[in-house]
């Protein structure tokens, strides 16, 4: 039985992801780690309408009865938890960011908040990009150095100590992508409006 507070955390983040257009009806997944256990969205569940039975518990290392119901991208979440100190993972399909990933090798925010929160988001390419070991290894390796990365044409993976934190990076990425789109549509020369401190540029 899933703890009520844990359920509410999953429900609220899932709903926020859907409301913010970070996923389609059945897309994306989220998870948290507790020691050697993982709680993850059920395969096929709708993030915008999560129920307690849509949260599946399974092992970080070993399969058990829950693995058959877990998200198809459980392998990626496991790899991320093994490679990083993350306690939460948010995987989304943000539309403008997906479009940018098809033409860029990294997404570099041009707005102040995006630059401060993310600086840049690398775009990772793999030959087989749906729940494969190749995909899991590539994403996990990139997240050793970044808190949010993008799988080309697929979606974002963000880590945090909480789901709120991982959601923040995801939402900031899509907002930054939207601002890039607006600026490109203006078709005018960008005006440099800020200078970053030395500590920021070395980060």
Q: Where is each model-derived feature located?
A:
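Glycine-rich flexible loops
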Residues: 1-203
């Amino acid at each position: 039985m899933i703890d009520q507070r844990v359920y509410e955390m999953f429900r609220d983040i899932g709903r926020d992801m859907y409301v913010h257009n970070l996923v389609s009806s059945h897309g994306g997944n989220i998870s948290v780690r507790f020691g050697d256990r993982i709680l993850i969205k059920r395969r096929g569940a709708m993030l915008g309408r999560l129920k307690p039975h849509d949260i599946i518990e399974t092992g970080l290392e070993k399969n058990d009865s829950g693995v058959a119901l877990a998200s198809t991208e459980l392998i990626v979440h496991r790899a991320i938890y093994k490679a990083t100190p993350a306690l939460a993972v948010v995987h989304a399909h943000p539309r403008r960011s997906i479009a940018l990933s098809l033409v860029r090798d990294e997404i570099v925010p041009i707005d102040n908040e995006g630059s401060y929160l993310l600086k840049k988001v690398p775009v990772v390419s793999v030959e087989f990009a749906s729940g494969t070991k190749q995909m899991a290894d590539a994403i996990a390796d990139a997240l050793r150095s970044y808190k949010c990365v993008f799988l080309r044409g697929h979606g974002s993976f963000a880590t945090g100590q909480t789901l709120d934190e991982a959601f923040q990076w995801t939402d900031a990425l899509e907002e930054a992508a939207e601002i890039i789109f607006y600026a490109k549509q203006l078709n005018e020369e960008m005006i440099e409006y800020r200078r970053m401190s030395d500590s920021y540029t070395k980060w």
